[in-house]
Amino acid sequence: GIMDSVKGLAKNLAGKLLDSLKCKITGC
C-alpha cells in the first residue's frame, strides 16, 4: 500500500544520509 512505499522511501533516504555521514566522519 501507500504506507509501505512511504516506509521504503524513508528507509532509502535514511540509508543514504547514514552513508554520507559515515563518509564524512570516517572517510569512505
UniProtKB/Swiss-Prot annotation:
One of its GO terms (cellular component) is extracellular region. GO terms for biological process: defense response to bacterium; killing of cells of another organism. Expressed by the skin glands. It is found in: Secreted. Signal peptide: none annotated. Keywords: Amphibian defense peptide, Antibiotic, Antimicrobial, Cytolysis, Disulfide bond, Hemolysis, Secreted. Pfam families: Antimicrobial_2 (PF08023). InterPro entries: Antimicrobial_frog_2 (IPR012521). Its main location: secreted. Disulfide bonds join C23-C28. The keyword Secreted applies. Antibacterial activity against Gram-negative bacterium E.coli. Very weak hemolysis activity. Belongs to the frog skin active peptide (FSAP) family. Ranatuerin subfamily. This is Ranatuerin-2BYb. The lineage of its organism: Eukaryota, Metazoa, Chordata, Craniata, Vertebrata.
